[in-house]
Amino acid sequence: MGSSSRSKGRRGETSAIHLLESRDYTCEDMSAGRASCDILALKDGIAWAVEVKNREIINPREFRKQARANAKKGTRWMVMAKIADTRSWLVERQGQRPCVWTEVGG
């Protein structure tokens, strides 16, 4: 992965953390680990293993597969995929319907 791709991914993770925190999640950045989720998010006693995707093309099946593989036992998975050229994210959480979250402020 090139440095511009890593920078884009890092920007996406930072934006995702801000969005999660605006929705009362507590977040821990896990992106330094290769075989783990990008973010560990906690809310209401539930731990979420979050995969963040900041790509032009959203591939939900591929993203879900990676999220499931990286979620540790006892942790639910979540995928946050940035919708290109918007302030919105497609969010899919284990056991819930996909939805769109929009960044506030800016």
Language-model segments: what does each one mean?
Residues M1-G106:
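Catalytic phosphate/metal-binding cores of nucleic-acid and nucleotide-processing enzymes, i.e., regions
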